[in-house]
């Protein structure tokens, strides 16, 4: 494990970058600022290492990043309609930071904070954060850890664990943007994807709040049950894609055993020879094709733009806390929040 400076935050605190490597030539870097996944170096079919996630060279880029490159999102990922929810008869008001809704817990997300480092060794780093009662509008003192592990099986494991002294809402995720040709390779539309999902969550309008329906993907451009290029139907004359400018939808995973870590997606790049398998124990995944990446200069001076990376964000159904019939992301006082998402690389 290598530790080095990653720049100084705007309030004068030093951020650190931790680099882990395995026996097969893979290498990942993570920072204590926002518990971001900064880089994932994977050997391609010719043995050349490619960095397959978008990001920045120092903490400064992450402080102003609105796209959440590599971010740990908390307390709640995705959207909450009306930026409010009711729990045990009490209404909790959150920040309205996208339209009239709350996105990724508001402008003071966990990805804009300096985390403590609890443990670091050659294969894993654990970041810890205390989120006090009322933080972002959520109830309860929530203590959470995020552990990044790089295995010799070429898997990046992200393990979340936390507890709270009151019942609260917790639905954390990682917002990495992947480009299996390399972060500097431009469009991801020729890369292929399989999603282990026969249903998706349609949205009401361009504000991207779900209708509450679980709609079949079959016969629509939302069908990724067999391998398909991301860009094959992204501009199709299909209302759901028009509303969101391309893919940015929740997919309900076909789980064999509820709560078990199972395959959720397989993405591949023929040009690099790199394949990524993604696994989670959560019930859903948000597939986002990077439709609204704001033009920005990233790592090594590379210019990022629309659809230069895609996200596979494991999660509960977005806005489930406000919808009847959905599994709600409620962490009860004294219980343990415990979930794992894995991105495994084949090269």
What do these predicted ranges mean?
Residues 1-347:
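An exposed, glycine/acidic-rich loop-and-rim segment of catalytic or binding clefts
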């Amino acid at each position: 494990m290598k530790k080095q400076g990653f720049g100084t935050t705007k309030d004068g605190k030093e951020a650190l970058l931790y680099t882990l490597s395995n026996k097969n030539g893979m290498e990942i870097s993570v920072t204590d600022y926002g518990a971001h996944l900064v880089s994932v170096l994977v050997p391609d079919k010719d043995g050349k290492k490619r960095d397959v996630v978008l990001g920045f060279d120092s903490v400064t880029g992450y402080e102003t990043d609105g796209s959440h490159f590599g971010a740990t999102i908390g307390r709640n990922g995705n959207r909450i309609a009306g930026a409010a929810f009711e729990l045990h008869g009490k209404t909790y008001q959150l920040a309205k930071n996208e339209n009239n809704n709350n996105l990724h817990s508001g402008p003071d997300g966990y990805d804009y904070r300096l985390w403590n480092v609890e443990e670091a060794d050659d294969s894993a780093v654990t970041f810890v954060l205390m989120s006090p009662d009322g933080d972002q509008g959520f109830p309860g003192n929530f203590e959470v850890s995020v552990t990044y592990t790089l295995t010799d099986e070429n898997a990046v494991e992200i393990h979340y664990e936390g507890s709270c002294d009151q019942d609260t809402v917790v639905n954390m995720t990682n917002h990495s943007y992947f480009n299996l040709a390399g972060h500097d390779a431009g469009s991801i539309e020729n890369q292929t994807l399989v999603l282990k999902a026969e249903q998706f969550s349609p949205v009401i309008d361009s504000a991207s709040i779900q209708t509450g329906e679980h709609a079949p993907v079959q016969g629509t451009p939302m069908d990724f049950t067999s391998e398909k290029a991301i860009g094959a139907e992204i501009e199709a004359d299909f209302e759901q894609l028009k509303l969101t400018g391309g893919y940015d939808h929740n997919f309900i995973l076909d789980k064999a055993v509820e709560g078990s870590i199972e395959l959720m997606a397989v993405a591949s790049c023929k040009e690099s020879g790199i394949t990524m398998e993604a696994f989670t124990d959560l019930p859903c995944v948000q597939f986002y094709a990077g439709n609204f990446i704001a033009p920005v200069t990233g790592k090594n001076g590379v210019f990022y733009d629309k659809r230069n990376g895609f996200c596979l964000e494991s999660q509960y159904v977005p806005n489930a806390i406000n919808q009847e019939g959905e599994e709600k992301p409620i962490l009860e006082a004294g219980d343990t929040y415990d979930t794992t998402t894995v991105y495994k690389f084949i090269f």
